[in-house]
């Protein structure tokens, strides 16, 4: 007898229902895309915004100024050694790299071959604290100064005489007037007489403020001279500073290798009253370094102690 109940089998999967899951996902995805397309863009939160750095401003690289370099040991340079052997001051200074390099090396103690006490060289410094060595020093050779003279002390070193001739010629050519000289080289013995005369007239303190004692005078080196204005006839040294020649010399002397050794601003260092007539020869290179460096005394130029008084 057959049972009225038939065995129950799982109903076959509907093809529509079997594809329902993928279709649902598709519908969902389409909905999302449509909502994104139709809805306004969401504003990102402040924390989500990445702040970009400001662009770097490109600046021009400054030009590198390359100047002359000083040798680590200038005194070992072949050119310096050769110049020292023949006592050529200009070549020695050139071997150091020029006037300013020479000065810098001396001040730094990097020039053991250079003595500021040697009166045979243009860089010698003689003052109230630095007597000449030897004290009765005399230059090896002298030449007549090619300018009008008011005394018989009309000589100087040959390089000084030549430079003075060029200076006087250019001053006249430029309309400044004629320049002569009162004194050039004075020997130790003549300086004894000169200083004694000042002592008689002004007393010891007055003499020491206006005249060097023997052995302490730049005139004894042959590197110094006192100049005067000669318009028709030559005047005295005291009037020189107020003349057209005095103004021209103050402005231009350095171009010929000279400096005005005793200025008003340097009295506390040198111990001498201003002497606009007293020219000291350093040579063109050192005089240019002195001028461009704004110096007013040789003591400052070579970083030496002030010397306003004698030791005794």
Model-derived features: positions:
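Extracytoplasmic cell-surface/polysaccharide-interacting catalytic and binding patches
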Residues: 2-183, 188-312
């Amino acid at each position: 007898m057959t049972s009225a109940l038939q065995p129950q089998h799982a109903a076959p999967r509907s093809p529509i229902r079997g594809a329902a899951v993928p279709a649902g996902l598709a519908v969902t995805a389409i909905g999302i895309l449509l909502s994104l397309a139709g809805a306004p863009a969401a504003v990102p939160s402040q924390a989500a915004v990445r702040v970009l750095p400001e662009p770097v401003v490109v600046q021009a690289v400054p030009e590198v100024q390359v100047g002359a370099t000083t040798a680590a040991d200038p005194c070992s340079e072949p050119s310096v050694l050769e110049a020292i052997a023949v006592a050529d001051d200009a070549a020695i200074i050139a071997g150091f790299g020029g006037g300013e390099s020479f000065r810098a090396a001396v001040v730094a103690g990097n020039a053991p071959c250079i003595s500021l006490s040697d009166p045979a060289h243009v860089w010698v410094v003689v003052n109230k604290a630095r007597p000449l060595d030897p004290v009765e020093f005399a230059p090896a050779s002298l030449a007549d100064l090619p300018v009008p003279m008011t005394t018989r002390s009309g000589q100087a070193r040959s390089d000084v005489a030549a430079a003075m001739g060029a200076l006087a010629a250019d001053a006249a050519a430029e309309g400044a007037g004629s320049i002569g000289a009162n004194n050039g080289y004075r020997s130790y013995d003549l300086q004894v007489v000169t200083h004694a005369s000042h002592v008689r007239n002004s007393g010891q303190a007055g003499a020491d403020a206006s005249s060097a004692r023997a052995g302490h005078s730049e005139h004894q080196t042959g590197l110094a001279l006192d100049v005067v204005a000669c318009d028709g006839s030559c005047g005295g040294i005291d009037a020189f500073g107020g003349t057209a020649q005095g103004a021209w010399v103050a402005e231009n002397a350095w171009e010929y290798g000279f400096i005005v050794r005793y200025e008003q601003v340097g009295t506390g260092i040198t111990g001498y009253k201003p002497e606009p007539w007293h020219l000291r020869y350093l040579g063109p290179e050192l005089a240019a370094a002195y001028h461009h460096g704004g110096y007013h005394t040789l003591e400052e130029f070579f970083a030496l102690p002030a010397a306003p008084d004698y030791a005794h």
